[in-house]
């Protein structure tokens, strides 16, 4: 069944007998899927609830829906994982956002690292963020997520440091930790986090984080960790981390 994310909370949807879908979703429902009155879709509210809905009326700029039933499906990771990626070259961040969304990331924080080759001014950063947000939304629909991960504004390194106290735990993926055999810290941290906790994981761009950046991150209570015995690419490391978290918190621990 086709899935759509709508900009209403569950409470707002329940306040009236029917609710309306507008914007780009209408084009997809009407012109791409060619749906009509009586067809059913899945709607996901802004606050992560999903409902089976029936189309009551269809026009070129608005679709009215009736909730048939709310479901209890929860496809979000038990912990909220924030992926902070030092801006990589090319379209690598698009790949990280698309696949990271499929693997359950809660949000993405692109930041300007010392070794980032890419330099974005405000205009380019805004345009990029719009594209990244669209990629996250499409990936969330495809993977049947309850929520669309938020793609935040491009941060400076200083802005990233200032945000670190917002999270329950912060991990710094550092290749020197892998080289030194420190591969158990990441698993221990994930195991210690209760359901609903927030975890920030910081990844460097190509070439990794500098020693100075790592030092400043650890001064803000970031914990350096290796991600296995092998050195991973900047676009591979976040996906490895998310897969490991999914295994440990969903398959192994069985949290729902």
From Swiss-Prot:
It comes from the Bacteria. GO terms for cellular component: cytoplasm. The keyword Cell cycle does not apply. This is Ribosomal RNA small subunit methyltransferase E. Its main location: cytoplasm. It catalyses: uridine(1498) in 16S rRNA + S-adenosyl-L-methionine = N(3)-methyluridine(1498) in 16S rRNA + S-adenosyl-L-homocysteine + H(+). It is an enzyme of class 2 (transferase). Specifically methylates the N3 position of the uracil ring of uridine 1498 (m3U1498) in 16S rRNA. Acts on the fully assembled 30S ribosomal subunit. One of its GO terms (molecular function) is rRNA (uridine-N3-)-methyltransferase activity. It comes from Bacillus subtilis (strain 168). Its EC number is 2.1.1.193.
């Amino acid at each position: 069944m086709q899935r759509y994310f709508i900009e209403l909370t569950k409470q707002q949807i329940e306040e009236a007998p029917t609710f309306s879908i507008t914007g780009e979703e209408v084009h997809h429902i009407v012109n791409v899927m060619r749906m009509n009155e009586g067809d059913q879709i899945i709607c996901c509210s802004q606050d992560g609830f999903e409902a089976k809905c029936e189309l009551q009326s269809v026009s070129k700029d608005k679709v009215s829906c009736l909730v048939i039933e709310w479901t209890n499906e929860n496809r979000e990771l038990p912990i909220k994982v924030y992926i902070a990626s030092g801006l990589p070259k090319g379209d690598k961040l698009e790949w990280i956002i698309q696949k990271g969304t499929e693997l359950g990331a809660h949000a993405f924080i692109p930041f300007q690292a010392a070794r980032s080759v890419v330099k974005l001014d405000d205009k380019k950063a805004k345009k990029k963020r719009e594209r990244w947000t669209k990629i996250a939304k499409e990936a969330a629909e495809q993977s049947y997520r309850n929520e669309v991960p938020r793609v935040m504004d491009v941060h400076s390194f200083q802005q990233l440091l200032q945000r670190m106290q917002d999270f329950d735990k912060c991990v710094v993926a550092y290749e020197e930790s892998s080289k030194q055999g420190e591969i158990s810290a990441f698993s221990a941290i994930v195991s210690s986090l209760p359901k609903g906790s927030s975890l920030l994981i910081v990844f460097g761009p190509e070439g990794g984080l500098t020693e100075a950046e790592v030092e400043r991150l650890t001064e803000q209570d970031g914990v350096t960790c290796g991600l296995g015995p092998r050195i991973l690419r900047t676009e591979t490391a976040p996906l490895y981390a998310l897969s490991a978290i999914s295994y440990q918190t969903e398959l192994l621990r069985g949290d729902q």
